[in-house]
């Protein structure tokens, strides 16, 4: 108990020695019998346990659990778990444990571990000479081994050199049960050809779980922790389990918010040293990772790996819902929101919701009226960088992406993807309200407003509202009188691009829209639609004032104007 208070970690209690003090460190090297858990366990009465503070009780648990793990490690075989260990793992008090609960376990011997170290050869050939050679350097030339000694637990060291040798073996008592030193001894005497095996590349130790091979038993034992949850480390905060204590330590910083690694250049702090190292490259501007295909350089190897998929066309991240594949996991995560319909990011200004935070950030620029991205060629400004990038291609005229079906070229792969749906007829975006499907997500978004009746885009000039931003843009031209779309054939100008497109048909004489009922042909689909009403007799446009119905909206407008003229003349 005094050891715990003073910060000294006892490795074991001297069992079988009358009057033995708990401070005494007795190693398995000096025992003739097999090593049991009793040899490395410490008992407390209720009074003794209550004398310890919380930190000391935690230290006791840590020492006992670590000793048990190391005992299993050194044994190299499965050891049934003592009740004390089960009690400690469950966070119960250990003072009420019976003595037999710790000692009634099958003995654990080192001999089994040592014999299994190397398949080709046991330890009996070189054990004596290595022990003498290793500890002879400490000034214990008179160290004697019992005749016929074959394993560690059969060593009989002279009592007169016990205290000095004990001091020599232990560099510090503050390190809990330094089994790595013992393992190093085992490795040295187990096979004189250990260095040769490292150079030959032989890996005689194979994991039965995953078939992975190792050249050293120590490495195999460490690897086994991945498969054995008993040796795992669990986060008390969230219950997440890790194979390594160092990984748990890093994970805990998520809960504590601790960021111990600080950049001296800009003061930014990080949870992991590796993240800080990566961050520092920003200040140096170094880009050590180069693409062999196109020569592009990156400051992170992960960025280069992702970039290479552009050349290979690899898309390892697949959506289980619709089968669509992506070259980045982040793109898949973003895509999945389409299926859930979730829109967690809401604009405080207008209430509009988005499925991505970046989209909300971009949307906010609309309210601010800010257009930070300006074209150096023509001076046109945009509120999205992607829009500026797309716009620049107008000046270069480049069209990298070609449709194999019709040969049409496009500036963007996304535009080509959308275009291909014309040939395939694919309409992946479906309205949950009415079941109507669309080939573009933007069309679905615009369509949904029909059901809500929402018109978020309002003209500041006249107050007229629209359900789509392009309609507002087209409307604004009425106030400005601007007619930017000019016909190259006759010079006539229009305020909307769609009107120019319709006008061009008059020059080429195209009459693609034909009505089978009367064989009459039209250059525009809208004109054909109006013509059909003549044959059906349908009059969908009603005048509320007179109760009259018309087959064309223009006739209704004319009727309304006529009514207002008559009213003004009266």
From Swiss-Prot:
Keyword Disulfide bond attributed:
no
Gene Ontology cellular component? nucleus
Primary role: May be involved in transcriptional regulation.
Q: Which GO terms describe its molecular function?
A: DNA-binding transcription factor activity, RNA polymerase II-specific; RNA polymerase II cis-regulatory region sequence-specific DNA binding; zinc ion binding
Q: Tell me where on the tree of life, at the top rank, the source sits.
A: Eukaryota
List all disulphide bridges recorded for this chain: none
Q: What is this protein called?
A: Zinc finger protein 430
Looking up SMART domains in the UniProt record yields: KRAB, ZnF_C2H2
Q: Where is the KRAB domain?
A: 35-107
Gene3D superfamilies the record matches: 6.10.140.140, Classic Zinc Finger
Keyword set, alphabetical order: Acetylation, DNA-binding, Metal-binding, Nucleus, Repeat, Transcription, Transcription regulation, Zinc, Zinc-finger
Cellular localization per UniProt? Nucleus
Asked whether the keyword Metal-binding is assigned, the reply is yes
Q: Where are the zinc fingers (C2H2-type)?
A: 205-227, 233-255, 261-283, 289-311, 317-339, 345-367, 373-395, 401-423, 429-451, 457-479, 485-507, 513-535
**Pfam families cross-referenced by the UniProt entry:** KRAB (PF01352), zf-C2H2 (PF00096)
Query: Which protein family is it in?
Result: Belongs to the krueppel C2H2-type zinc-finger protein family.
N-acetylmethionine: residues carrying this PTM: 1
Q: For this UniProt entry, what is the primary localization, expressed as one broad class?
A: nucleus
- BP GO terms, sorted: regulation of DNA-templated transcription; substantia nigra development
């Amino acid at each position: 108990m005094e050891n715990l208070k003073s910060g000294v970690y006892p490795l074991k209690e001297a069992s079988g020695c009358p009057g033995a003090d708990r401070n005494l460190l007795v190693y398995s090297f000096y025992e003739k019998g097999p090593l049991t858990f009793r040899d490395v366990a410490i008992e407390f009465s209720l009074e003794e346990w209550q004398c310890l503070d919380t930190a000391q009780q935690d230290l006791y648990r840590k020492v006992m659990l670590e000793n048990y793990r190391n005992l299993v490690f050194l044994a190299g075989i499965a050891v049934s778990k003592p009740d004390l260990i089960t009690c400690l793992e469950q966070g119960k008090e250990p003072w009420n444990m019976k003595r037999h609960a710790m000692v009634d376990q099958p003995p654990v011997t080192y001999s089994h571990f040592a014999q299994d170290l190397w398949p080709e050869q046991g330890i009996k050939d070189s054990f004596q000479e290595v022990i003498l050679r290793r500890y002879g350097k400490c000034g214990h030339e008179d160290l004697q081994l019992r005749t016929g000694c074959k394993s560690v637990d059969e060593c009989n060291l002279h009592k007169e050199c016990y205290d000095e040798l004990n001091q020599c073996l232990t560099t510090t008592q503050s390190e809990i049960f330094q089994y790595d030193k013992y393992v190093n001894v085992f490795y040295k005497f187990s096979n004189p050809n250990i260095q040769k095996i490292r150079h030959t590349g032989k890996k005689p130790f194979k994991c039965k779980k995953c078939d992975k091979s190792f050249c050293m038993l120590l490495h195999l034992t460490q690897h086994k922790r991945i498969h054995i949850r008993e040796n795992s480390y669990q986060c008390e905060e969230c219950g997440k389990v890790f194979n390594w204590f160092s990984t748990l330590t890093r994970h805990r910083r998520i809960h504590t918010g601790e960021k111990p690694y600080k950049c001296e250049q800009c003061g930014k702090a990080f949870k992991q040293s590796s993240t800080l190292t990566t961050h520092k490259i920003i200040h140096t501007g170094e880009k050590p990772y180069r693409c062999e295909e196109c020569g592009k350089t990156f400051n992170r190897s992960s960025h280069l790996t992702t970039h290479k998929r552009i050349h290979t066309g690899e898309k390892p991240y697949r959506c289980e819902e619709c089968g669509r594949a992506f070259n980045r996991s982040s793109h898949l995560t973003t895509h999945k929101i389409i299926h859930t319909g979730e829109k967690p990011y809401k604009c405080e200004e207008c209430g509009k919701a988005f499925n991505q935070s970046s989209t909300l950030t971009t949307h906010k620029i609309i309210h601010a009226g800010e257009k930070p991205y300006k074209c150096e060629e023509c001076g046109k400004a945009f509120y999205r960088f992607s829009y500026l990038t797309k716009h620049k291609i107008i000046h270069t005229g480049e069209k990298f992406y070609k449709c194999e079906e019709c040969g049409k070229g496009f500036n963007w792969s996304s535009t080509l993807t959308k275009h291909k749906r014309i040939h395939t007829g694919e309409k992946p975006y479906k309205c949950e309200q009415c079941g109507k499907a669309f080939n573009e997500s933007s069309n679905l978004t615009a369509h949904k407003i029909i059901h809500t009746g929402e018109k978020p885009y309002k003209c500041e000039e006249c107050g007229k509202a629209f359900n789509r931003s392009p309609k507002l843009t087209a409307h604004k031209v009425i106030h400005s009188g601007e007619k930017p779309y000019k016909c190259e054939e006759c010079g006539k100008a229009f305020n909307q691009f769609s009107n120019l497109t319709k006008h061009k048909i008059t020059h080429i004489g195209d009459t693609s829209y034909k009505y089978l009922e009367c064989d009459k042909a039209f250059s525009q689909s809208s004109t054909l639609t109006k013509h059909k009403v003549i044959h059906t007799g349908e009059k969908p446009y009603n005048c509320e004032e007179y109760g009259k119905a018309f087959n064309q909206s223009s006739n209704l407008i004319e009727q309304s104007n006529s009514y207002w003229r008559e009213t003004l003349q009266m």
